[in-house]
Amino acid sequence: MIFNPVISNHKLSHYIHVFCTFTTFCILGTETRQAITALSTYTPAFVTAPTVLWSNCSSCMLMGIMQSLNAYTWMKDHQVLFLGVTTGYCGALSSFSSMLLEMFEHSTNLTNGNIANHTKLPNRAYGIMEFLSVLLVHLMVSMGSLIFGRQLGKEVIVAYGSSSFSKPYTPPSDTVKENAGDVDTQEMEKNILEFKFKTPAPFFKKFFDVVDKLAYALAFPLIILFVVLCAYYENYSRGKWTLPCLFGIFAGFLRYWLAEMFNKTNKKFPLGTFLANVFATLLIGIFTMVQRGKKHFSTDIPIVNSLNSCHIVSALISGFCGTLSTISTFINEGYKLSFINMLIYYTVSIGISYCLLVITLGSYAWTRGLTNPIC
């Protein structure tokens, strides 16, 4: 085999481009989710806080827009940017494991507010209603946001932002693969055959170029910034604003690797996303148990009873677990499956994840008890 330095350098630069862009969007997605959660936590709120409902809604809408832009070949020259926005930013902005934790806490009456105020459900059967309330609201809002985003991208952005028709194209071999769960090559090919491929207006091309270059350039400065802030500030920001973004980088790449490795094994069941969501839910149950579980049955002191340790666990919950799992890709994959396969995929994912929370967090809560964390 003849070594070609030109090809090798091209692949290396492509991988560096993917790494930097994906890292930037993972950091921004995690930080955005933290900000939206903090912004939506107020009294009296129509949507009970804290919740990731707003984050899931926003990420699914953006995912829908990007799907339409890519289907009409707007992103053909910016496939790395497309990967960063969909799998990176939208994946980090939304959270499957946090949704499952909300579902478990509300259905078992174990939210922080219920424990602090000694609030009880009329009877335990109302836990079923709470379970369905969280499940249906999250899924319906997320699916509705995805569909709205796709129509917004198709009927508004593509329809009014295209300058002309362009020639069909063949994606390069080093572009983003469809195994990540966020690329629909079948829809793209269908639009090409129907001569629906369009060229974005110069403004959008320039905008994509600027965002792509910024994401490429900001990766290492952002990493250095958050490392310095995390080391310097020892207050609540470590568990809420700085550490979660650093943990989110590793979680985002793990989720992408799982999707690349396992989604192609079964087209009717995206195994990679399933493994990422289930594993993240298992971890969030364990971390929540450590943070909120009573150290002794007779006291309200949690297992993690130092402030710094509590901040680290909080960062693992919101940063690593929140970014490792995703609703935007989960909903987008279900949208592209047949209705029966979608039901199977959603039911198995949610059912197994909820059972893992019952086994880990539930068993400890019902034997030793939960309390509010110290941070």
Swiss-Prot record:
Residues 33-34, 101-127, 235-241, 290-310, 360-375 are extracellular. Disruption phenotype: Highly sensible to fluoride, but not to other halide salts. The growth of a double deletion of both FEX1 and FEX2 is inhibited at almost a 1000-fold lower fluoride concentration than in the wild-type. Has increased intracellular fluoride concentrations. Glycans are attached at residues 109, 117, 235. It is a multi-pass membrane protein. Residues 1-11, 56-79, 149-213, 263-268, 332-338 are cytoplasmic. GO terms for cellular component: cell periphery; plasma membrane. The chain crosses the membrane at residues 12-32, 35-55, 80-100, 128-148, 214-234, 242-262, 269-289, 311-331, 339-359. InterPro entries: FluC. Keywords: Cell membrane, Glycoprotein, Membrane, Transmembrane, Transmembrane helix. It is found in: Cell membrane. GO terms for molecular function: fluoride transmembrane transporter activity. GO terms for biological process: fluoride transmembrane transport. It catalyses: fluoride(in) = fluoride(out). The keyword Glycoprotein applies. Present with 220 molecules/cell in the plasma membrane. Belongs to the fluoride channel Fluc/FEX (TC 1.A.43) family. Fluoride channel required for the rapid expulsion of cytoplasmic fluoride. This is Fluoride export protein 2. It comes from Saccharomyces cerevisiae (strain ATCC 204508 / S288c).
